[in-house]
């Protein structure tokens, strides 16, 4: 079985500071948002400042330990929003190009062993390339 990070490297994608977003939800399910072409906007609305990273690897829960690869998004910025008794964070993101052949087509086997919906990491830069 091939690992997702290996598949991304084959596609020429090398990530620096990233978080894995394990998208779940019942009120407005992320899978519905994905198939209705509004997942990017769905993901950009957060109750906390969850995406303190350069890139987001988005996975949408399907069942048990199966997750749909929903793309990689570059984090462009964040704005804290307030309205009456409500507060949230609105992210600006840009979907990484060149992954159309994988997005929505790859099912990742991943056993989530943590409570938060986000898992952070810093990936190695490819040999011979400077880190930004």
Feature locations, PLM:
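Contiguous surface segments at macromolecular interaction interfaces
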Residues: 1-11, 19-23, 65-70, 78-132
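Compositionally biased, charged N-terminal/linker segments
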Residues: 1-53, 130-132
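Short connector loops at helix/strand junctions that flank enzyme active sites
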Residues: 51-54, 68-70
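Short conserved beta-strand and strand-loop elements enriched in small hydrophobics
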Residues: 54-64
């Amino acid at each position: 079985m091939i690992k997702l990070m290996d598949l991304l490297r084959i596609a020429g994608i090398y990530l620096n500071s990233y978080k894995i977003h394990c998208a779940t939800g019942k009120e407005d399910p992320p899978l519905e948002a994905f198939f209705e072409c509004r997942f990017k906007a769905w993901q950009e609305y957060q109750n906390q400042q969850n995406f303190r990273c350069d890139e987001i690897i988005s996975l949408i829960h399907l069942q048990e330990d199966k997750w749909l690869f929903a793309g990689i998004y570059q984090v462009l910025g964040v704005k804290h929003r307030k309205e009456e008794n409500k507060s949230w964070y609105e992210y600006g993101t840009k979907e990484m190009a060149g992954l159309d052949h994988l997005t929505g087509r790859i099912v990742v086997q991943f056993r989530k062993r943590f409570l938060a919906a986000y898992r952070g990491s810093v990936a190695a830069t490819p040999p011979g390339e400077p880190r930004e």
